[in-house]
Design a protein with these regions (language model features):
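Acidic, low-complexity intrinsically disordered tails
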Residues: 1, 744-759
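Core nucleic-acid recognition elements
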Residues: 1-5, 38-176, 180, 193-199
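A glycine-rich phosphate-binding loop feature that marks nucleotide/adenosyl-phosphate handling sites
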Residues: 46-47, 65-67, 82-89, 201, ...
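Function-dense linear segments that define catalytic or interfacial modules
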Residues: 159, 166, 173-191, 195, ...
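Terminal amphipathic helices with adjacent charged low-complexity linkers/tails
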Residues: 79-112, 151, 341, 422-452, ...
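Polar, glycine-rich mid-to-C-terminal structural blocks
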Residues: 320, 329, 333-411, 419
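Catalytic alpha/beta core of large soluble enzyme barrels
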Residues: 126-152, 436, 442-448, 491, ...
């Protein structure tokens, strides 16, 4: 048997030479510098046993990285940095052929000539500006990544050939180039200052960017909106136009929300009875095929959530579309579903009444009123219930809601949209710009209008551009003022920078300029401040934090409106009438959280009325599975599943350790330590008081805490009503504890069926 010293290795150029164990030792020792509880010899031992004669130098490096990553544990969390440094070393060798990165200008020129980068970067910036930025870039920041972060960067974000897996750049170039692209149209006198500040904010993880921006800005493909909302009308032309729009956007990195709630029910009359309608299911299948026709720009698989009202005449057949029973003909399992509910339907449930199902085309005005005017909806609904000439199905509300919650529990991916909250506590005036749907991950609430053809100028496709503040990286809430200004400027510039494959999306985006800025690392933020999800101790801090965030973002958008003018559809917002989120939130929250307001909302109100806003919306709290890993942060507003979680994605199994594990391990509250959903839902309600769009809020159930190890229907319905009571607009995943070890609990797909509208 060969001893490691006898082995020959295959160099990159194909030559064979004796293995240099000293060199390996030097690299591992360098990577271990300053880290605690890591053993160089253990990494070497673990990797040596996997070496073989003729092994390629690349494979040696990969083996050592993997050996270090396998040692990551609660007792030895620093191996995540040792493995990351080795991976960065390897990455630079692959991208540049050596450890030292090239000059920024040389790098950009080389990749532009190769067709990987957009030519405008070389055209817009002078050689002197390149020199100044090259001197500013801090490549040492690559050393602060965790292993999970480097693997996510390699898999999803760094510009590469996705077929051969050849990577062409390293993280600091990614960050500075995103900044250069977004601020390229700013005046020469100020733009380098913005580029540097934005580079600092993103490369030190204070601001987190979504996948489409990280992987796409600087390349020739210019579509970076994370979420696309497409509404379909009750006509074949519109169904075809919707299908084309889905294909166009799925191929360009976007996740889709489809509103199909207007489509008439099975056996409705077509052309006055000349034909019978085949119902929704054949058309939903068509949408599923369109969604799955492309992967999102090679970065992730296509994904969509489809919306319909709970009172649709086919509701009973639609609620079961995702489950594992039934046959192919009556199941559409590759879409997620958003079921739309309002006050009247909940009232019928509470009072033990019935729900009447209708086909939307047979009840004039009802579908529009469902979103725009709750009193009018109630008047029409009861009127149509009493009309003997209208086709209907009557079901006990308890039965329909039980089916809904059973399917939500069984699949985890039947989502809830409270459409009244989405319109009464909204930046948009529902009389002129009602919100009819949400998006893939349930955090977007923007107006849409159906298309009759793909070039329909009267249709409206809503796009939302996302990013997030890292709460854990803030020193104080006033820091949000500068970060809000930078982020709003960058994302607003992005709207003009990107291309629009469908005209209905361009006109809508140019008119509304909607942004969705959220947060990551909330669980760490709570732990660091010594408060918890479950006991009410975090309510005050959460109120202060989200107040500051919404206040400073609105302020940034007013300042931008002073410079560039308000968005052209500002008159369709309630902001133009002087209304603010602090006026329209659900007052039931006051009994839960009595924290006063700390900012000068009245002078902000006056400024908004006077100057307008550059952006109709500013906030949305999205899931952030991937970009949280980059920042080594906890996911969005979620409690972690364990202090060390194992995540499986197509780039392999990754271990992630919560921030400041050593000092805060007893301060964290993990998902399955929460006694129930109530504490979490109250916090979501407090966030929703300020957040102008919606929140990807999840519910979680541990069957072990229930009689007979079965989650009770009563508890699920109680949580649904609690969420409604506190003004929560949407509910996303339903998580069930499956009894696996907590460190393994996160092995699933990338969530969001491919992660499109998360960051």
């Amino acid at each position: 048997m060969n001893t490691p010293t006898d082995l020959k290795v295959t160099k990159r150029d194909g030559r064979l030479e004796a293995i240099d164990l000293d060199k390996i030792h030097r690299v591992v020792t360098w990577a271990a510098e300053g880290l605690e509880n890591v053993s160089v010899s253990q990494v070497e031992l673990k990797s040596h046993i996997q070496f073989y004669n003729g092994i390629r130098t690349d494979d040696i490096h990969e083996t050592i990285i993997k050996a270090a990553a396998d040692l990551i544990s609660e007792d030895t969390p620093d191996y995540q940095y040792l493995a990351a440094r080795l991976a960065i070393f390897h990455l630079r060798k692959i991208a540049y052929g050596e450890y030292e990165p090239p000059h920024l200008y040389d790098h950009v020129k080389k990749l532009t000539d190769a067709g990987k980068y957009d030519r405008h970067i070389l055209e817009d910036y002078s050689r002197e500006e390149f020199d100044e930025l090259n001197a500013y870039i801090d490549h040492e920041r690559d050393m602060s990544f965790s292993y999970a972060a480097v693997k996510q960067l390699e898999g999803k974000y760094l510009v590469q050939n996705r077929v051969t897996r050849q990577i062409y750049e390293t993280p600091q170039f990614l960050y500075v180039l995103v900044a250069m692209c977004l601020f390229s149209k700013y005046p020469k006198e100020t733009r380098l200052d913005y580029v540097k500040r934005f580079y600092d904010a993103v490369s030190t993880f204070k601001v987190s960017l979504p996948t489409p921006i990280m992987s796409g800005v600087r390349t020739p493909t210019r579509q970076f909106s994370s979420c696309v909302l497409i509404e379909c009308d009750d006509s074949l032309d519109s169904i075809n136009a919707t299908t084309s729009a889905i294909v166009k956007y799925v191929s360009q990195r976007a996740g889709i929300g489809i509103n199909a709630g207007r489509i008439r029910g099975l056996d409705s009359e077509i052309r006055g009875g000349e034909a019978r309608h085949t119902g929704c299911i054949p058309f939903f299948k068509m949408f599923q095929a369109a969604v799955k026709s492309c992967s999102q720009g090679g970065v992730r698989g296509g994904a969509a959530t489809l919306f319909y009202p709970l009172w649709h005449i086919e509701a009973e057949s639609l609620l079961v579309l995702k489950n594992n029973r039934g046959v192919e003909d009556n199941r559409i399992r590759q879409l997620d579903y958003g079921v739309q509910i309002n006050r009247l339907l909940y009232t019928r449930l509470i009072k033990g009444g019935n729900i009447t199902l209708f086909s939307p085309n047979e009840v004039p005005g009802l579908y529009e009123a469902f979103f725009a005017d709750q009193d009018e909806f109630e008047r029409l609904y009861t009127k149509y219930e009493q009309d003997p000439n209208i086709r209907k199905r009557i079901i006990p509300a308890a039965d329909l809601f039980s089916t809904l919650m059973q399917e939500r529990a069984g699949t985890g991916r039947i989502y809830i949209q409270n459409v009244d909250h989405c319109n009464t506590h909204s930046p948009f005036d529902p009389r002129v710009a009602p919100v009819h749907q949400s998006n893939l991950c349930m955090e977007i609430a923007l107006p849409t209008k159906p298309l009759d053809n793909i070039n329909d100028p009267d249709g409206e496709i809503a796009l939302c551009t996302l990013s997030a503040f890292n709460l854990g990286a803030l020193n104080n809430l006033d820091e949000l003022e500068g970060l809000a200004d930078l982020t709003v400027r960058a994302l607003d510039a992005l709207l003009d920078y990107q291309g629009y494959p469908v005209e209905a999306a361009r006109t809508s985006t140019m008119g509304r300029r909607s942004l969705g800025i959220g947060v990551i690392n909330y669980a760490y933020y709570l732990a660091k401040n010594g408060v918890r999800y479950s006991d009410g101790s975090a309510l005050g801090l959460t109120h202060r934090t989200f107040e500051a965030m919404q206040y400073y973002l609105l302020k940034a958008s007013v300042n931008l409106a002073k410079e560039y003018g308000a968005c052209t559809l500002f008159n369709q917002t309630v902001y133009s009438q002087g209304k603010l989120p602090i006026d329209t939130y659900k007052k039931d929250l006051d009994a839960v959280c009595n924290e006063p307001l700390h900012y000068d909302w009245e002078s902000l109100r006056a400024d908004i009325v006077k100057y307008g806003l550059r952006n109709s919306t500013l906030t949305a709290l999205m899931p952030s599975e991937t970009s949280s890993q980059i920042a080594n942060a906890t996911n969005g507003i979620e409690p972690p599943r364990g202090l060390v979680t194992v995540k499986a994605s197509k780039d392999g199994i990754l271990k992630q350790v919560v921030p400041e594990f050593e000092t805060l391990k007893n301060a964290y509250e993990t998902l399955w330590q929460l006694p129930g959903n109530e504490g979490y839902l109250k916090l979501v309600g407090v966030m929703q008081k300020f957040v102008d769009q919606a929140i990807s809020a999840n519910t979680a159930y541990d069957p072990g805490k229930f009689e007979g190890n079965k989650v009770s229907m009563k508890q699920m319905l109680k949580d649904l009503l609690t969420a409604y009571k506190y003004g929560v607009k949407t509910l996303y995943y339903h998580n069930t504890r499956d009894g696996a070890d907590d460190t393994q609990a996160d092995i699933q797909d990338d969530g969001c069926a491919g992660g499109a509208c998360k960051i």
